């Protein structure tokens, strides 16, 4: 069973949320009506030996691990077009983690929180005989009429991607990435985004989630996807994951204006495909042949 299939079964068992929950489970954040704005809520975690490494050639400084924990959550707020405001951090750490290591871990989180004006308002700390697990819950806000969801892509929309893709582990990007809060906020406030999400599990897999949520197909140009290094292959760009870039669906007429107005010279914005009407949500190539979806799945 895939991760998405598991969650579909789980969500079907949950009570229907009240109308105050404008965005229910299944998007990058949940969203609760709060006056003229929405309160955004998301949670993400990192596991030692999976999201950062305790030993070996990719051994991770504790500051980098703590930074990554918050950065992953900031990327979810960015995907909704929101502004991050506060967070809570809960961690269970193994016996080798002395107070000095823990302080350095929290230093990494706090430094990034200061950079993004996020207040750490609470959390929990525990020990474990196993690998570290740390979870962060983030809160944010967005205007009710500007929130971006996965489900708004329309036939004819252009799919654009920020940044570059692939080779995340080899380049250290999986630790040093910049959450696209600035870019996501700009796209939301300027009204360009019909749908948006961040890429954590690979471009193909996350693009397929937009297709599923929006009930459309996507004609993707794999060769158009910007690669992180000259050595990065197309397959790596499509499936490696941990890119933490944004995928955004924009109307065909608006796409040209968006590219002309894009103010972030340090972050490329690239058209990589077009959404199509289809009976089955899927990703196809230029000839209409389905592209096998690849990416990181925690249950596969």
Predicted features, each with a name:
Residues 96, 175-243, 276:
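Active-site-proximal betaalpha loop/short-helix elements
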Residues 31, 73, 81, 120, ...:
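Residue-level signal for inorganic ion chemistry
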Residues 139-141, 247-251:
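Short hydrophobic/aromatic beta-strand micro-patches
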Residues 22-24, 40-43, 119-123, 161-162, ...:
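General beta-strand structural signal in soluble alpha/beta enzymes
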Residues 259-300:
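Acidic, Ser/Thr/Pro-rich beta/coil linker or hinge segments at domain junctions
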Residues 33-36, 83-169, 274:
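Glycine-rich anion-binding loops of enzyme active sites
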């Amino acid at each position: 069973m895939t991760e998405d299939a598991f969650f579909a079964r789980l969500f079907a068992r949950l009570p229907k949320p009240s109308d105050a929950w404008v965005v229910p489970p299944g998007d990058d954040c949940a969203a609760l009506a709060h006056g003229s704005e929405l309160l955004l809520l998301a949670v993400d975690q990192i596991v030692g030996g999976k999201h950062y490494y305790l030993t070996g050639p990719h051994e991770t400084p504790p500051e980098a691990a703590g930074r990554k924990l918050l950065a992953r959550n900031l990327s979810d707020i960015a995907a909704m077009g929101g502004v991050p405001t506060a967070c809570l951090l809960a961690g269970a750490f193994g016996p080798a983690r002395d107070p000095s290591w823990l302080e350095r871990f929290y230093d990494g989180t706090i430094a990034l929180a200061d950079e993004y004006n996020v207040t750490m308002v609470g959390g929990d700390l525990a020990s474990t005989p196993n690998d570290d697990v740390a979870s962060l819950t983030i809160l944010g806000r967005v205007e009710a009429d500007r929130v971006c969801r996965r489900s708004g892509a329309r036939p004819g929309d252009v799919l654009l991607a920020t940044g570059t893709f692939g080779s995340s582990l080899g380049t250290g990007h999986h630790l040093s990435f910049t959450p696209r809060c600035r870019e996501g906020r700009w796209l939301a406030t300027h009204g360009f985004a019909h749908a948006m999400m961040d890429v954590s599990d690979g471009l193909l897999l996350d693009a397929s989630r937009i297709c599923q949520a929006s009930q459309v197909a996507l004609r993707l140009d794999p060769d158009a996807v910007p690669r992180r290094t000259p050595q990065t292959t197309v397959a790596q760009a499509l499936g490696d994951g941990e890119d933490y870039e944004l995928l955004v669906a924009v109307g065909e007429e608006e796409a040209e204006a968006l590219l002309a107005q894009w103010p972030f010279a340090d972050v490329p914005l690239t058209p990589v495909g077009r959404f199509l009407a289809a009976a089955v949500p899927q990703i196809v190539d230029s000839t209409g042949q389905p592209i096998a979806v690849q990416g990181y799945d925690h249950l596969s």
